[in-house]
Each structure stands twice: as structure tokens, then as C-alpha cells.
């Protein structure tokens, strides 16, 4: 039988680990298109993702736990992206940055992957072409909140509709 003291220690330890993961995200940007300019703007001093624990990008996926997929992914890049994802440290999170990464954008053709969630699990989607820096920071804060709670918000295996995505990232009124 588990005592209340043991449960308290486990719960407190889980909360501490969640807090540490929330504020120490090691990011790896996989930048392929024009959203890369907006990603650089978010990383620079005016918006500064370092204030939110997602500091300087790492030079190898083995050192990172947050993958930013920024821009269009074509079928030739798909194996490289999947390999980068496999090399990342666990637990890992993925953000689809912009309309092209989330759904293929306006590149509806034979060469473009229609959303990176067809290849790897995606935890958060940032809409826009390109997305505003405020939207990127809002997404990062919401992902950190979910990391602190110990859950991944959206996984690729789930049946997620466009309405679910809109509801997920709609502004909170309460």
C-alpha cells in the first residue's frame, strides 16, 4: 500500500521535473523556406525566445529536445527530417512553424509534403504565412505550459481536424 508521503514525493518530483523541462528547452531549427526570416526575428533581441527558456539553437539534434520545423518540406527532405527527429533526445517536442510546415501551404503539388505531421508527431502548430512573432511566443508559452503539466498537446496519430486546431489555438476568453 502506498502512503500519502510517497505519493506527495512522487507528485512533487514530477512537478519539479516538469518545471525544469519547461524552462530549459534546447531547440533545433529545421529551416527550409521564407519563414526562417521570421524565426530569426523571434530569436533576436526584440522578442528574444531566450527569456522563455528556448535559448540559442543547438548545432546537432542530439543536443536538442525541441524541433522547430520552419517552412516547406518536400519529399526529398522528408528522410532527413525523420532522421533528425530520431536523433533528438527524449522527451522531445515538435513545433510546425507556419502554414507550409503545418499543411503544405500553397504548395499543393507532387513534390511537397502536405504537413509535417504526415512524417513525425507534431505537438504544436503555428498558423500564418509567415506567423507573427507574437503568435510564435504565444505558441511557445502554451507548449511550455503543457510540458510543465507533463503532457503533449497534439500528436500526429490523433484524429485532429482543422476545427480542433482552431479551437486549440483560439484566444482564451476566461
Model regions: which residues?
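C-terminal functional extensions of proteins
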Residues: 116-174
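Generic secondary-structure transition motif, activating predominantly at the C-termini of alpha-helices
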Residues: 17-24, 89, 144, 148
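Aromatic-enriched hydrophobic runs in primary sequence
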Residues: 9-16, 85, 110, 146, ...
Amino acid at each position: 500500500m502506498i502512503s500519502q508521503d510517497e505519493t506527495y514525493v512522487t507528485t512533487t518530483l514530477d512537478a519539479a521535473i516538469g518545471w525544469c523541462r519547461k524552462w530549459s528547452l534546447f531547440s533545433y531549427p529545421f529551416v527550409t523556406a521564407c519563414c526562417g526570416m521570421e524565426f530569426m526575428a523571434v530569436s533576436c533581441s526584440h522578442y528574444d525566445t531566450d527569456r522563455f527558456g528556448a535559448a540559442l539553437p543547438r548545432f546537432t539534434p542530439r543536443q536538442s529536445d525541441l524541433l522547430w520545423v520552419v517552412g516547406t518540406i518536400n519529399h526529398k527532405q522528408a528522410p532527413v527530417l525523420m532522421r533528425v527527429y530520431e536523433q533528438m533526445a527524449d522527451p522531445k517536442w515538435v513545433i510546425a512553424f507556419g502554414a507550409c510546415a503545418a499543411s503544405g501551404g500553397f504548395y499543393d503539388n507532387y513534390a511537397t509534403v502536405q504537413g509535417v505531421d504526415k512524417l513525425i508527431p507534431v505537438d504544436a502548430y503555428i498558423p500564418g504565412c509567415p506567423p507573427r512573432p507574437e503568435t510564435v511566443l504565444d505558441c511557445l508559452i502554451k507548449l511550455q505550459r503543457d510540458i510543465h503539466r507533463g503532457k503533449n498537446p497534439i500528436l500526429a496519430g490523433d484524429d485532429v481536424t482543422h476545427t480542433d486546431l482552431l479551437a486549440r489555438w483560439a484566444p482564451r476568453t476566461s
